[in-house]
């Protein structure tokens, strides 16, 4: 039996006691800021790339976007992160190769890109497939027959149903970004929850590891619940 499990409901885990004293309170904002930035970057760039590929189906734009997306999916973040450091920090000297410095933008760019790249690729592929399916539906043909501008058709009629599969993917993407941040924060030396988790595991601080696992699990459940609510709001077919 693990005595720490019984203390969860009593708010007595060692990490939470440290959290209440403020000793480790700075770790969570670092991970939250990086994760939120990577998540929104993945959604914005992924949806944009997917829509462009769908509208330019079977053209060089489509092949280029899907080729880059396939590359982004198969290359893991722990390979992308050192490559970005080598290119942009060591060779070109454009960006710092690590550190946080209060969350300055130039210190966030490389870890944010490394963390979001695979999800940009996945969202682009999902958006493309969904958008192509929507563009061949009857109500889009009707809108075209009425002479509506293509821009209005995309923004007013096609985009919303095409984003439903993307919305379903946001839950797993959020979980992946949380777990992936552990690797990224360690590589870039960021003082976030991920690095705290790795240090706790290496130092055999099981109370800390258990506490962080519970925290990540709670955030995952919360975000999946939010996604389910948003899905019901956007898609009236599944409302009860």
Question: Residue spans of the language-model regions?
Answer:
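N-terminal, intrinsically disordered charge-dense segments
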Residues: 1, 19-26
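Membrane-interface segments at loop-to-transmembrane junctions
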Residues: 64-68
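A hydrophobic, multi-pass inner-membrane permease signature
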Residues: 72-80
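Short clusters of hydrophobic/aromatic residues that line enzyme substrate/ligand-binding pockets
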Residues: 5, 94-95
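Alpha-helical transmembrane segments of integral membrane proteins
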Residues: 28-61, 77, 90, 100-240
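Short, small-residue-biased leader/transition segments that mark boundaries at the very start
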Residues: 11-14
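Phosphate/pyrophosphate-binding betaalpha-module
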Residues: 84
């Amino acid at each position: 039996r693990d005595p720490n499990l019984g203390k969860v409901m009593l708010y007595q885990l060692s990490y939470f006691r440290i959290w209440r004293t403020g000793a480790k309170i700075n770790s969570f904002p670092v991970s939250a800021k990086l994760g939120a930035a990577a998540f929104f970057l993945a959604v914005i760039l992924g949806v944009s790339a997917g829509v462009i590929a769908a509208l330019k189906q079977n053209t060089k734009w489509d092949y280029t976007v899907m080729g880059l997306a396939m590359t982004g999916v198969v290359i893991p973040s722990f390979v992308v992160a050192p490559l970005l450091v080598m290119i942009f920090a060591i060779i070109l000297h454009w960006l710092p190769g690590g550190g946080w410095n209060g969350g300055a933008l130039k210190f966030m760019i490389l870890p944010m890109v490394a963390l979001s790249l695979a999800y940009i690729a996945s969202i682009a592929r999902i958006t493309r497939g969904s958008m192509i399916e929507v563009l061949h539906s009857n109500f889009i043909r009707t809108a075209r027959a009425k002479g509506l501008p293509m821009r209005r058709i995309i923004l007013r009629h096609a985009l919303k149903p095409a984003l439903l599969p993307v919305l379903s993917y946001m839950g797993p993407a959020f979980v992946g970004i949380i777990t992936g941040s552990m690797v990224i924060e360690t590589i870039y030396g960021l003082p976030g929850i991920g690095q705290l988790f790795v240090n706790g595991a290496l130092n055999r601080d099981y109370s800390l590891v258990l506490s962080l696992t519970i925290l990540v699990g709670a955030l995952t459940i919360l975000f999946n619940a939010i996604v389910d609510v948003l899905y019901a709001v956007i898609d009236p077919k599944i409302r009860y």
